[in-house]
Design a protein with these regions (language model features):
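Solvent-exposed, non-transmembrane regions of membrane-associated and secreted proteins
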Residues: 5-112, 116-168
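N-terminal Sec-pathway targeting helices
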Residues: 1-2
Length: 168
C-alpha cells in the first residue's frame, strides 16, 4: 500500500508560474520498466496531503501543479504494490539516469522526459521543496513507496522519487 502522507504543504506551490493549457496527462509510459498506465487527477485533501491513486495499476497526477511539459515540477504518483502483488510503480526504484519517460497529454502531444536521478527519502524527511518547489523549467517527479515495510502499521517507511527533465 502506498502512503503519500508525507507530501504536506503541496497547496503552497500550486500552479506557480504555470497556466492550465488543457494538456492534462492521460497516460504515462516507461518502456524500460514496462509501465503503460492511465493517469487520473489527484487533489490534496483537507490536511494538505496528496492521496494515492484509486487503483493499483493506474497513476495519479497532482492536478494543482503544472501539467507535464509545462514550467515547473509535474508530479505523478503510483502504488508500488498491493496485497495481491506488484503495482504500477513496482520497478520505479530500478530506474537509472538517462531513461525516457513518455507522458501522453489531452491535447494530443506527448511530453518526453529523461531521468536525472532516483532518490529514496524517509517519510519523516520528505523533501517537499525539492519535489514541489517552483523551478524555471519543465520537470517531472514520479513518487512511490519504498524501503522497509512496517507490517504493524501496514506502510512503507520511505518514498522513492524519480527526478526527470524535459528531453530537448
Amino acid at each position: 500500500m502506498v502512503v503519500l502522507g508525507v507530501l504536506l504543504l503541496v497547496a503552497l506551490t500550486s500552479r506557480t508560474g504555470s497556466q492550465a493549457t488543457g494538456a492534462d496527462p492521460l497516460r504515462i509510459r516507461i518502456p524500460t520498466i514496462e509501465v503503460d498506465a492511465p493517469v487520473q487527477p489527484l487533489i490534496v485533501d483537507e490536511n494538505g496531503v496528496l492521496p494515492p491513486p484509486d487503483t493499483y495499476d493506474g497513476t495519479g497526477w497532482w492536478r494543482d501543479g503544472p501539467e507535464p511539459g509545462e514550467r515547473g515540477p509535474a508530479v505523478i504518483a503510483g502504488h508500488v504494490d498491493s496485497r495481491r502483488g506488484p503495482a504500477v510503480f513496482f520497478r520505479l526504484a530500478d530506474l537509472s539516469s538517462g531513461v525516457r519517460i513518455f507522458v501522453d497529454r489531452a491535447d494530443g502531444s506527448t511530453a518526453v522526459f529523461t531521468t536525472q536521478r532516483v532518490e529514496r527519502y524517509g517519510k519523516d524527511a520528505f523533501p517537499t521543496d525539492a519535489v514541489y518547489g517552483d523551478i524555471p523549467d519543465p520537470e517531472l517527479r514520479l513518487i512511490t513507496c519504498g524501503g522497509e515495510f512496517d507490517r504493524k502499521d501496514r506502510r512503507y517507511l520511505d518514498n522513492v522519487v524519480v527526478f526527470a527533465v524535459l528531453a530537448g
